[in-house]
Amino acid sequence: MRRYSTGILKRGYAVFAAILFAAAICAPSAAGERALSVSLSGNARAPIGWIEFCSQHFEDCAAAPNNGRDVALTANAWKDLVRVNQWVNNNIKPMTDAEHWGAVEKWSYPDDGYGDCEDYVLLKRKMLMQAGWPRHTLLITVVREMSGDGHAVLTVKTDKGDFILDNQNEEILLWSQTSYRYVKRQSQSDPNVWVSLGDPRPALATATSR
């Protein structure tokens, strides 16, 4: 098992401190609250990869009762996010579904150490749930890159905003700080219900390829 990078952890804690400082000095406004969380704009179709994944992993797809609350972003919670994001990004090697499975689209846990973006997301979601994070705060999200290509990231719902865990970025950012246009994601009420996202921004050329 690869050890966590001290540099990444220190940068992660610096970001966390900056988030808390900004929250302390900035009075929330309606516009500011909208910027912290991407808006919803209706229902969407669940990706076929998710549907097929759930046919084999019922326990990871079932809806569970929840209080609808976002996670309090404490120092320990932030540490969980930084470590899980880094561990998965460092220990899973990128491989397309065509190379891996001979299929156009297949979502699976990267048990053999290889996977594409959805597989990174599935493992991060699983590890955080095993660490005690509520399922309804960990939402698989489909985004669009500047090239027009689709990509998947994990949205983490916290009381400080929607943060993104991404296999293309070691840093954990607010959704509005990333380069992507947000298309759809799982509903907080049921992981099998997907919702469209009201993100009018074009994708920007700031992501690092991986």
What are these regions (language model features)?
Residues 2-4, 29-210:
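A structural boundary/capping signal
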